[in-house]
Amino acid sequence: MHFKYIVAVSFLIASAYARSVQNDEQSLSQRDVLEEESLREIRGIGGKILSGLKTALKGAAKELASTYLHRKRTAEEHEVMKRLEAIMRDLDSLDYPEEASERETRGFNQDKIANLFTKKEKRILGPVLGLVGSALGGLIKKIG
């Protein structure tokens, strides 16, 4: 008789344990889904910020390029234009990485000047900030 009670109690304990494990798995999966959704939202916001920043940098680079384009250039300004072109290619490669890699393999010799900096971040941000600073300095000098 005691054997039946032992089997019944062990069966109840096993089923309660199975239910608790199942509930834990459900709560973990719900938590994972919520974390994944919040990560997607964060990535979406980050993507929008980066997209806006890329657009602003492209606009600034195009404006500087058009400023230097319509007048005679010195060797230093010519080097600046080459860097601007490299920056524009890098910004485009962020949007279309497959096409950019194809372009780079086709025109490798033309891109030697663009490869002055080793990392893309340095190639994009360093020259842009320098060019924007020098352009603003030149404008302030002309105004003042």
From Swiss-Prot:
An example Gene Ontology CC term for this record: extracellular region
Disulfide bond found in the keyword field: no
Compartments reported by the entry: Secreted
Residues that bear Isoleucine amide: I143
Record-level GO BP terms: defense response to bacterium; defense response to fungus; killing of cells of another organism
Top-level lineage group: Eukaryota
Keyword terms, alphabetized: Amidation, Amphibian defense peptide, Antibiotic, Antimicrobial, Cleavage on pair of basic residues, Cytolysis, Fungicide, Hemolysis, Secreted, Signal
Propeptide stretch(es), residue numbers: 19-43, 73-122
Pfam family, one: Bombinin
Expressed in which tissues: Expressed by the skin glands.
Signal peptide coordinates: 1-18
Function (record text): Maximin-3 shows antibacterial activity against both Gram-positive and Gram-negative bacteria. It also shows antimicrobial activity against the fungus C.albicans, but not against A.flavus nor P.uticale. It has little hemolytic activity. It possess a significant cytotoxicity against tumor cell lines. It possess a significant anti-HIV activity. It shows high spermicidal activity.
Homology family: Belongs to the bombinin family.
Protein known as: Maximins 3/H11 type 2
Organism, as annotated: Bombina maxima
Taxonomic placement: Eukaryota, Metazoa, Chordata, Craniata, Vertebrata
